């Protein structure tokens, strides 16, 4: 829906072999953590291993397995979440292509096929942010 605004430009960071980027919800309403069905993080064509991906929102960090039952934390349209994974970024002076893929379920929209599932993607080019 709002795919070109998923990745917040200039938020790529790297620390201890992990890369992270801030992401915004590509939907117009808040969703509970249980509706974040999956994500992928790729830098310069290399994907972070799925089992290393972590989702941070509201100062809490979750694996995607933990998000399945998470109804206490919500992702709001005005708030950024952080997607991170084991993915070293070696050259912090170069421009890097960052891609985020998100899978969301929208529980209040029911179709003939069940609950609405959306997949959105965004790619941006940026340098590693200086901390």
From Swiss-Prot:
It catalyses: 3''-dehydroisovitexin = 1,5-anhydro-D-erythro-hex-1-en-3-ulose + apigenin. Optimum pH is 7.5. It is an enzyme of class 4 (lyase). Keywords: Carbohydrate metabolism, Lyase, Magnesium. Activity is strongly reduced in the presence of chelating agents. Optimum temperature is around 40 degrees Celsius. GO terms for molecular function: lyase activity. Its EC number is 4.1.99.-. It comes from the Bacteria. Its cofactor is Mg(2+). Heterodimer composed of an alpha subunit (CarB1) and a beta subunit (CarC1). Carbon-carbon bond-cleaving enzyme which participates in the metabolism of C-glycosides. Acts on the C6-glycosylated compound 3''-dehydroisovitexin (3''-oxo-isovitexin). Shows weak activity with 3''-dehydroisoorientin (3''-oxo-homoorientin) and 3'-dehydromangiferin (3'-oxo-mangiferin). Belongs to the C-glycoside deglycosidase beta subunit family. This is C-glycoside deglycosidase beta subunit. It comes from Arthrobacter globiformis (strain ATCC 8010 / DSM 20124 / JCM 1332 / NBRC 12137 / NCIMB 8907 / NRRL B-2979 / 168). The lineage of its organism: Bacteria, Bacillati, Actinomycetota, Actinomycetes, Micrococcales.
């Amino acid at each position: 829906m709002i795919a070109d605004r998923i990745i917040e430009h200039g938020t790529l960071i790297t620390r201890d072999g992990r890369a992270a980027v801030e992401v915004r919800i590509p939907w117009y309403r808040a969703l509970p953590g249980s509706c974040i069905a999956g994500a992928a993080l790729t830098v310069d064509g290399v994907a972070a291993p799925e089992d290393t991906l972590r989702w941070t929102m509201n100062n809490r960090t979750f694996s995607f397995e933990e998000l399945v039952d998470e109804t206490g934390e919500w992702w709001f349209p005005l708030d950024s979440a952080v997607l991170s994974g084991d993915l070293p970024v070696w050259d912090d002076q170069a421009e890097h292509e960052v891609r985020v893929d998100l899978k969301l379920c929208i529980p209040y929209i029911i179709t003939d096929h069940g609950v609405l599932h959306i997949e959105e993607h965004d790619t941006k080019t940026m340098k590693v942010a200086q901390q």
